[in-house]
């Protein structure tokens, strides 16, 4: 791993599955809530500007940030503004759970918040064609993707579903794209016809899907049944996994220490207790912050970040949730 600590930021370039791309820009940045608006029923948007003259780190479509909220809450939100705007970040927040409730009810224009990132495990890859599938607040990372696809001159289509039209954010912004955006509220059209959309996918098309877990599971099932490759998903909640927790050993290659990971305790918890500092955030396998190189052994992947190809490669794992398939792992820690 190379670290560039210029300008107070830590930029990590990790060889392997990211092919030496920027994986994340990590550091605390103080942001001012410059704007707050209602985007839809139960959804508010925040516009954030850096406090001071340093500005905000750059980002690409698919990226998210952490917001440090009250009562020790840290939540991840997809950036949904224009990556070319170096002065502000924009996020959309669905009122669901204590973190988003805090944003809806207590965060006001003029407040200062701590943000971290951005990070991107849902990066928009270059392709001639795209199919975007969005459900509910899952449209937030997709919004900047369709703008990027349009700017690149690629063919694309967006299928966007929600419970009802009044609860679907960004409809006015998306209307400028005409028939390439299909708005399908459930109370008017029923469930999204994922199978129909995926049957039309041609070779070279990348499929990006973000939404509630049942929708993501259905998309994965349809792609498997139809033989559609190129599916990339992002989850806002942990993916259901099956497996029995058993104890195993982890060797920390940088220090030579070996730690016992007991059943019911994560690798992350164990190494933190042993005094090893590891970047982490969600602690449920959805954000990718704790991604760690695997030097030996076979991981039991339980995260919602890695693709099937990346899991099969076995070179990285999310140590907040994933475990070992055998009795021992060697990690670059």
Features from the language model and the residues they span:
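Residue-level marker of beta-strand positions
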Residues: 64, 111-112, 273, 289, ...
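A short, sequence-level motif marking secondary-structure junctions
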Residues: 63, 80-84, 263-268, 306-308, ...
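Short polybasic amphipathic segments
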Residues: 65-67, 248-253, 290
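C-terminal accessory/binding modules appended to enzymatic or scaffolding proteins
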Residues: 246-279
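Ferredoxin-reductase
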Residues: 15-112, 116, 125, 162-164
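FNR/FR-type flavoprotein reductase catalytic core
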Residues: 2-15, 100-254, 260
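Short flanking/linker segments adjacent to small metal-binding domains or redox-active Cys/His motifs
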Residues: 187-189, 262, 323-333
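Local cysteine-cluster metal-coordination motifs and their immediate loop/turn environment
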Residues: 141, 276-303, 311-326
